[in-house]
Amino acid sequence: MNTFVVAAPHKCIGCRTCEVACVVAHSDKNIFTLASSKIKFYPRLSVIRTATVSAPIQCRHCEDAPCANACPEGCIVNKEGVIYINQKTCIGCKTCIVACPFGAIDMVSSYEDGEKKLQAGLKCDDGGKLCFKEKMVANKCDLCIGRKGGPACMEVCPTDAFRIVNSDAMERSIKEKRHQSVIGLSMLGSK
């Protein structure tokens, strides 16, 4: 079973600290020393707030990942139990966004050597002038693959709202639900 991270909405306060930690974890530079115009703020999770609840939405790393199955270029793969997007080969077709049942994938600008990458060979008509469009690629949670401390969002959450769901946690949850179900059934039989 693929591991994923989930946040408890009843604990989340919508502070977006997890989004900042995600950006820091995936940045090749110290964003705290950069001018705000130079920061590539592309978190791989999105905190959603409503009038009654807030929680981050992030990839569930599906077993039979619809995004991976939909990708015409094969850019989305299972890498060490993580559904991973190879942004270098992504063509920005957005098929994965349509396929994702959780809304966990965004399109972001592609960068190379700190500069926005332009689409190769695609020109657009801009008032009679030729211009080049920036290259956009898919972006989503990768569980901070390769990061020593694991997912950065979990490490910084002030309310400890995040938890890792892996096969052990899932098995414990199933056993607890079954236990509660038996208790409920036994109460029915005693009436």
Segments from the language model and where they lie:
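N-terminal cysteine/histidine-rich coordination modules
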Residues: 1-12, 17-18, 23-46
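Flanking helices and flexible, charged tails adjoining ferredoxin-like Fe-S electron-transfer domains
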Residues: 28-69, 87-191
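Short glycine/acidic-rich loop motifs that flank beta-strands on beta-rich extracellular proteins
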Residues: 80-81
